[in-house]
């Protein structure tokens, strides 16, 4: 394992994988979120690490709060712990990862905005607020 993977396992009790950006672990009521720099079809804002905007799951067309990954993450009975890490890109090349740690999800502050999808078409996306 890399040092970051070891840190994530130590902090969360969970292993991560490189698939989707929302990794729900129901057995530990934990979600590990990944934000990737310069992803034009998402609108993540990590400029203030204490108050982050994170785009929910869905790359093409309108996002759906009932999408399995979104619905599970937003359910306070299923998910109690939320963590975030960032994939740092420079000119499209992965330069490494940054661990942001544990956050609180403000489930009452889910905002819908218009933003391009993976194909460049305007669509509705959802942004959630993560706070330290």
Region locations from a protein language model:
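Compact mixed alphabeta submodule
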Residues: 93-132
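Acidic, glycine-rich low-complexity segments with interspersed aromatic residues
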Residues: 1-96
